[in-house]
UniProtKB/Swiss-Prot annotation:
Ranges in coiled-coil conformation: none
Superkingdom of the organism of origin: Bacteria
Gene Ontology biological process terms, A to Z: tRNA N1-guanine methylation
Record gene name: trmD
The organism of origin for this protein: Onion yellows phytoplasma (strain OY-M)
Function, in words: Specifically methylates guanosine-37 in various tRNAs.
Pfam family, one: tRNA_m1G_MT
GO CC annotations on file: cytosol
Family: Belongs to the RNA methyltransferase TrmD family.
Keywords: Cytoplasm, Methyltransferase, S-adenosyl-L-methionine, Transferase, tRNA processing
E.C. numbers: 2.1.1.228
Name of the protein described by the UniProt record: tRNA (guanine-N(1)-)-methyltransferase
Amino acid sequence: MIIEIITIFPLFFKSFCETSIIKRALEQKKVQIKLHDLRTYSKNKHNQVDDSVYGGGVGMLLSFPPFFDCLQKIKTPQSKVILLSPQGKIFNQIHATNFAQKETHLIILCGNYEGVDARILQYIDAEISIGDYVLTGGEIAATVLVDAITRLLPEVIKEQSFLEDSHQQGLLKHPQYTRPQSYLNHEVPAVLLSGNHAKIRCWRQKESLKATLQKRPDLLENKKLTLEQTKLLTEIKQELQK
């Protein structure tokens, strides 16, 4: 996959691209990340890419021409163009999975200041937000998208690792433990030490449902549960009512 990011702060992504899974994915050529400095597309002698808002208002707006000219240069018929904006649809694991599985070329536009000139909207395919709050710029949101999508690409991480992630199956992940087995009377649940894989699987399933019910009950509203999950969820609700 090729991911191209249009930004006025390309250096923001330097450490991000040199860290952890993203670094490994780049080295193994599972993904290419190309940064485009919006200022290089400015026709202003000072490389200015923002201006005041027509009709009055506070703050500065990123101009239309630099974005348009950059898109004209890098966009292909296979491109999916994404504008990061607080007005966009909330990004979730389903979006990440769809992008990873269906797209080969993503172009991410990072807004800043008061946003972007609305004329760019007719040249994008999706407007995405990472939450109902406002950030200084789209760069932080861009790293969220790139990380969430890249880890789902083939051979970036073991498939079983992300299949067990929270949200990947529509539920939160079960609690996990590591050594030591006991510390100041804080014990690892005995079932995880039993070696009984059937009981461990059942415990994890139940704890996953319990965590989802307690922390994100909204995820259960449209979730199609198996008969086993339905039975476990009933048990959990009865236990919590005691």
